[in-house]
Amino acid sequence: MSKKKPIVQYYDPFDLWPSIATDIESKIPLRNLQWVESYQYKKHTITSLDLEFLPWLEEFSSQDTSKDPTLLNIPLVNMLFLPEQDGEIYKTQHKPLATKWFQKVSKNENQSWMIVLVAEAQQAKRSNSLRRTHSRSSSYFAVKSTIDRVRGDFNTGNINHCVRLDYVRFGTPDAEGWNEFLKCLEWAVLSSLDSRFLQLSEQIRSIKLFDSSIFSDYLLFFLQKERLAASFFDLVLYRESLEQCEDMFSTLSKIISAIDGKKENISKYLGEGSDAQPDLKDFNSSFLILGSRYNTLHNLLADGDFTLFHFTLFLLSKIILLNLKISDYEKAFSTLQQALLFLTSSFFNEFVQNNLEIIAAFNYDCYTLLFKKITEAIHNNDTPIPLCCAKILLYARRQLTRMARWNNLIDDSSPLLWREPSFPLIEHHDNSLLDNRFQKLSETISSTSSFLSEYYRLSSEALSIFKAYKNRYSFVNTACDTGLAQYLLEDYENAYASLKNVDVQTAWSNDPLEEKWSKFYVDLLEKLEKFDEALEFASAISKGKVSIYNKNKILELSKKTAKSKVWNLDDFFTIEIPHMMAVVPHDDGINLSFMCESKVFDLESVDSVTCNYVLSSSKNPMNLLFTLHNSITDGKLNVHCNDIIPGRYHLKTIVFKLKDSVLSFQKDCLHSNKQIEVLNPTKHSNHLYILQSKISQQFQNDGIFACIPIMFGERFYKASCSEIKLSYIENSGFTNLEKSFLSEESHCGLESKTDSLVIKNIQKVPGVAKLYIPLTNTPVEGNEFLINLSYILESGQTVRFGKVLHIENAGIVEANCEKTNNMRDPLTSTIFLHIQPKEPIIFCSWNCMRKTKQGTYDNVFDIPYNIPVLSPMDCFTSCHFDSDMSIDLKFSMNCLRLADVVFMKLCVNIWERFDFIDIEHIMPLLDHACQQISLSNITQGTVVLPEEIRKLNGKKILNSFFDNEELRNEFSEFIQHLESEVSFNSLRSFVQEFEKKERLKNLPFYFSLHQTIGPLPFKDEMQSTTIEYIWKIPQKVLLNKPTEITLTFLRSLTHSKKEKQGQSFEIFYNFPAYTTTILFAGPTQRKIVWEKNQTTAQEQVTAVFLTAGRVMLPEVVVHSKDDDISILKNTKYTLVGRPLNDQPDLDYAP
């Protein structure tokens, strides 16, 4: 599309142009013209409009322009130059000439005109009729009179067509003169443009196109549209020109759609011969990208090439060129793709199939030429390269790859074709035509190395663009292609460097070609002798998948490296481990069976398996080490351990090792729920153990102790030495180990050391040894700790194991004691016990101890109760005390959780019925079920057993307890017929019976679930401080009148025989600032500090009473952090009177 300058035609009868041409042309081009089109009121901004000044030619102005390719072929403006003379010369000589010229130019449609009056320094000879001498001033005014006459003679309407250029006053026209000239010229240009565009737009609008329209209608429409587009182009309005071309292509697309792929319909819409097939000479990239073949549609018609093929490419070439002009490179690229896709339409199917290689070469040339034009444009404009350039390079690379395949430079299995879509193959092709028309491309595909070099160049340039735009997906794919090209060029180091820039494992993880890419990458690493990295990569891509690289390849790589490799077991093996198993050791140890499978390796290749079970502890863990008992068969893994230590273990690690390989696979299971519980040894074993995990707190010897029952197996004394060492972790709440002791029935001694306790001098197997270890001075709530036991067997083996113990929560109940005096007998006092249970308990006894002068404690009283307590209750007793004896009293209470009593009763009942089974198996399940007991389970003196107890009847549980079906059925029937409710009386009887020693000796297990709550908070009324407040109000109080009120606080020490010296404390008070009857102003809330010996405190407030009559003052809320301070309420009323209406304001009403 060639650009033409708009024309201004000038008429110069007095030869003025040579002297002023330079000045006028220096003002051109016109800048920033604002044109509002009259047709659609569209606003256009012409940034720069160059004009061509041509001398007057009458035929040129009046010629027929209907066939011109642009609206600018004829002059836009006709201009007349006249010299400036006096009025007489103008009237007799210049005006007739100007009038004759004006009559000619005014007949030309769509052309503007203007008259330029030029005042020269050497003026023409004046007329002889002017006989007087003119001064400069009179000449100036005469000249002014001349331009006014010209305007009066020729101007029409309010438009000024006449301007003056003054070369007399300053040798050149001033700025005002030039502005007037340019303004007139701009108006004339825009007026002509608007008129012409309006006329052409109306002509196009009058063309009605229908499905039944004939060829001539469509052709006229396209010709007029092209004139409009070309005219916009000449005015540097590229976007407007592009809009017209796109409108033309939209209409052509509708025609193509109506043709419906039938050649016989092409002639109907585009005329005879328009269905002709293209010729090979038409495939020139400059025709499509640069539009160099046909400038206008008239040229296309004149050459007889108006076919569907030529016309479509003609329009698309215009659109590509205009998009390049406006720097819309992405749109230019998409238009090129649209044009190349059009070549593959069904209209040209036969031609395409016969010329696949030529079309591919043409496509390659078009992509490379477009890339070249874009890079040249951005280089001139100093702008960043657009992202579409990378896509252009990749499309060019695709065409290049196809031609390389057709020339047998690569075969169908080449990795360069992995990502490429399928394309037809050419059995016989002639390179002579390709050599003649695409010589440079022919050289590129003359050899494999030249092709790969060009492939690498295109890929690397695209890669740099993707990298600049941080387009991760395209960058990764192109980096892989670049590395692949370098690999095929045997440049392995650079290929490795290209692939290291991306995470190839992640990039290929979801790629359908993952296996091919992975093999290529491993081969590259092997060529570089990076065997360790190749092995790691091969293992990473094989995780959990049906062997991309089978075991043979991985094993082969593992033999090339000397480093041992430990991989995650879950990535290659699947092991089904039960969440919880209760296991019973046999004579030779413990056997465990798991299901195992692998998608990568054969299980026969596993050489060894090691399972490490750890006793739950953060320090000094105790281990059970299981090893492979035999080979893995039928997907079943059998492991064995002969180191039998009772306790609950969680799985820590599993390690698999392959045969003849440095590879091993490990699974870490810290904090795992994959657990086993070794419940034995029981009473028949040669071990000792701690059965209970819940440890009670008891108040003994003026302190709180944890009672730990240690169970001894029947053969323990024969199988071990006479010492047992106990140690525990720090921060367990234990203190003063030297105060630890054993119960009297333990029949052994105890020695305390710095960090451990030693049970020694075991005279006989005691069954149970109750160990009391002192805790801190306050009850410990919910504290867990690990206690470790160790002893040496007769065989010399040292057995070490631990037990996680949970100190039973002492917060199951809140209790305190309070003492009041008997006024009649000062030495007799009443002691109250206030109990606030947090869950159902059995209150066993209430104890009081007194410290003697020797530092020991004697019992004052020990009152048994053995009653259930479900809600707050108070107990009291009367005691005889000396004067100050109360300060040395220690109170405590013993209780049992109701849930624990039910648990003990159920355990005993089961043991009595099934004394031949190990009750330890079922105890954890019973305990868990009984913990569900709450207040909702208690009705009318009975405890409703939780439904969880019935679940012990499950098949899995029964199978784990009993070996034969008869015992399973008997136990199932026993559970089924358990009473659903247990009375409080039966529970009380059970507790009393259970505490008898004879009964305890026959049990194979031991309970120590009594909770001792103490020392209890104790409050002595004799030493309590009392705070009383008093409202002091004036005698007369009036309605709605401010009244000063005093709030007085009084302090007294009730029945105190001696007050602690120097004691001070704080109280806090507050009362509402507003009630329905009183409004207060003043400190309604405040803190008061009582100093030593201070007895009163006062606060002043102002009150306004809102109601007359008897009014009650608000209650003052007083509280203190000191529990020994009592608050006495003092309710106060006052009478509020009404003031008389005729009385003046007084402080008090009469």
Curated annotation (Swiss-Prot):
Q: Which InterPro entries match?
A: TRAPPC10/Trs130, TRAPPC10/Trs130_N
GO BP annotations of the record are: early endosome to Golgi transport; intra-Golgi vesicle-mediated transport; intracellular protein transport
GO cellular-component terms in the record?
A: cis-Golgi network; cytosol; TRAPPII protein complex
**PANTHER family xrefs:** EPILEPSY HOLOPROSENCEPHALY CANDIDATE 1/TMEM1, TRAFFICKING PROTEIN PARTICLE COMPLEX SUBUNIT 10
Q: Which family does it belong to?
A: Belongs to the TMEM1 family.
Q: What is this protein's record name? A: Uncharacterized protein CC285.14
